[in-house]
């Protein structure tokens, strides 16, 4: 399941979902501070949510 975690630059929630086996991505207007830029999208979370790429958004 592909999950978008909106308004999250720390990647704490993203990491927790990844540890549970989900394909999770954080999204924020800022660069991430969690150390996994490959799991982070810099941009508008609303536009990303409507892209149709995700099964769930938090």
Which functions belong to the PLM regions below?
Residues 1-58:
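Catalytic phosphate/metal-binding cores of nucleic-acid and nucleotide-processing enzymes, i.e., regions
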């Amino acid at each position: 399941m592909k999950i978008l975690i909106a308004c999250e630059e720390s990647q704490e929630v993203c990491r927790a979902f990844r540890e549970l086996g989900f394909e999770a991505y954080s999204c924020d207007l800022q660069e991430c501070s969690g150390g996994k830029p490959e799991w982070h999208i810099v941009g508008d979370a609303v536009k990303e949510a409507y892209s149709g790429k995700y099964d769930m958004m938090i």
